[in-house]
Amino acid sequence: RQRQMCIRDRYIGELYMGHLRYSTTGKSGMSYVHPFLRRNNWRSRNLLLCGNFNMTNVDQIFNTVVSQGQHPRIYSDTFIILEQLGHALDMEHDRLYREYRDKAADGNGLARLIEDNINVDNILRDQARLWDGGFVICGMTGSGDMFALRDSKGIRPAFYYHDDEIVVVASERPVIQTVLNVGVDDVKELTPGSALIVGKNGGISVDDILGEGENRRCSFERIYFSRGSDKDIYKERKALGENVVPDLLEAVGHDLDNTVFSFIPNTAEVAFYGMMEGLEARLAKQKADAIKALDASAADYDRRLAEILNKRLRQEKVAIKDIKLRTFIAEGASRNDLAAHVYDVTYGVVRETDNLVVIDDSIVRGTTLKQSIIRMLDRLNPKKIVVVSSSPQVRYPDCYGIDMSRMGEFIAFKAAIELLKDRGMQSVIDETYAECLRQLELPMDEMENAVKRIYAPFTDREISRKMAEMLTPAGTRAEVEIVYQSIDGLHRAITSCPGDWYFSGDYPTPGGNRLVDKAFVNYYEGNADKR
């Protein structure tokens, strides 16, 4: 009867695990789909693994696994960690086998004793200390134990909820709220360095595995990846939009009468609301000052007062996006082709004397801007196009789970390199390469980010101007300017997640400095596909 139920009901188990992880290797295919499975005839030795992560020291972990006598078939962080934790599970299994082999009546009884007494802490504690990276790693044994472990600096997000009937862990809070219909205070953040462990008997604990380190929660999660429906993220994205108002006003000469404001769908919409609120506040002050300056006894007082009160910001839905397509997470080979077919525009809302301001959540590679957005916006014949980024300039690669690992992909980096060449400063590029090679000879915990030298000679605005020049397609009629969020503005908006290595180059772990130096060496040596 139990077998018939399992056949009839596909999802009949008590534990479910999966991850909608887009490949951070720049590739796709079934071999990259989580979870990964380590099989064994002993039920308690089976292990499933999935996670939101990348490790920066896969070679070190690989060498540790090999030193234990293993010979892994695949060299990837997920597979190596699966084998590492699988070996630790085997050791825990053997410990319990020795302890209970004389106390069990038969093999099945011994297997049950082992399953009932597996200590997940023993599996995680020593192994996880070898990991350098940002991670939330979830695992499940064949006997029914489950765990979710978060890195000690909180780089990758994790939230959980439990009651008498269910335990759930996810990377985002609002999805738990929506699916289970629970309040925001019912969903807890998994403490960095801790593991949520659910035993086969239903017991739940949050155990300190690595200790909580310095807070380096990832700010880019909040800007782009996470759902904007989260209570805190919604406020943060609005604040990001408001913080760019002074610089965008300067870009349009404070001419609100001849400026149309819009956004690049879809993740920038909330930042757009914040930007408009900031502009409304400034317009309200302008109105108040203008009213105070009026002569109430003048014959045209009523007309002039009405003109002031009727002033409105011109906001329109100018860009239209196919909601099914996201160019940021597309594979490198298809990104350019995809970018040209994602957007359309609304005609008839922009005059030839207008500035057109559009805000986007971030400008990383600039592919979509050059291949599609600027071309489309220029068809509306504005005098000037101002593209505003709610995030700062993305200057450095990520190595903790977001697919931004090649140095030469970043438009900010390309712009800095071009500026160095324009000004006869090739020596800075050569010296940076030499310093990166020197850094890579040091122990990992002594390495520094040598790539900061590339940006040091220039101001943010100089780099932004060069980016605008490089991203403006040939034949564009409008003047194009790019305005970026400042790093200070980022931190004022997102106070709880100070991890800003993409923008500042200040990596949260030693492995980050190693990989950024390695990324520059690959770029300099012409190995564009290496990560």
Where are each of the predicted segments found?
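Active-site proximal loops enriched in glycine and acidic residues that flank catalytic Cys/His/Asp
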Residues: 139, 150-151, 171-173, 200, ...
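Terminal amphipathic helices with adjacent charged low-complexity linkers/tails
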Residues: 203-217, 263-267, 271-297
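Extended, hydrophobic alpha-helical segments in both membrane/secreted and soluble proteins
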Residues: 261, 268-275, 279, 315, ...
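PRPP-dependent phosphoribosyltransferase catalytic core
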Residues: 127-128, 143-145, 150, 162, ...
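Short glycine-rich phosphate-binding loop at a beta-alpha junction
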Residues: 254-267, 386, 480-485
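Phosphate/ATP-binding catalytic cores across multiple sugar-kinase/actin-like superfamilies
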Residues: 130-133, 237-257, 270, 275-278, ...
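Amphipathic alpha-helical
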Residues: 99-118, 279-289, 297-298, 304-318
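Conserved short alpha-helical segments that host acidic/polar catalytic motifs at enzyme active sites
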Residues: 1-4, 8-191, 197-260, 264-265
